[in-house]
Amino acid sequence: MNRDSTPSQTEIEYRQVISYCKALFDKKNKDYGTSWRILRLPSLTDQIFIKAQRIRSIQEKGAQKIEDGIEGEFIGIINYCIIALIQKSLEGSDQMEFEATELGRIYDEQVEITLELLRNKNHDYGEAWRDMRISSMTDLILMKIFRTKQIENNDGKTLVSEGVEANYQDMLNYAVFCLITLKNEQQQQQQQ
């Protein structure tokens, strides 16, 4: 939010991306329920890795054999990061099923926490991400995945670094930035 309490352009675009991701999350929840509750955090990290690695492969090769584009992979990264944050927040709980409204509230809660992190970082760094290449942000997502894997291999212990939550939040935000950038690039191409 700006000083006058109106949302910034970034927040508006961010919420548009998240709204689309949540709608897909809700549909998959209707199809599969909360079967993802069985996944441990390292399994979710690996799912995020698969998505990010496919994006990088497509970026490097300039082609793909499977029809789904990178946009869908970024959406998957966002939803898997939110699922991981939900899982982390529910550590110790053996509850497997959630009512749709409760699950929606928990999803939104993790988004709001992560959006607050974005606001704080944008305050300090400006909107540097807007000048970054999508390929660079993809590399940063992959780096965060490898950091997360190392933390997981160390039983979640760090000496001076942030824990896995911060890495999931950063990956989520970079994936949102990539989708915003892709959308803006598509709009610019259509205007030409």
Question: Residues of each region from the PLM?
Answer:
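Intrinsically disordered, low-complexity regulatory regions
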Residues: 1-192
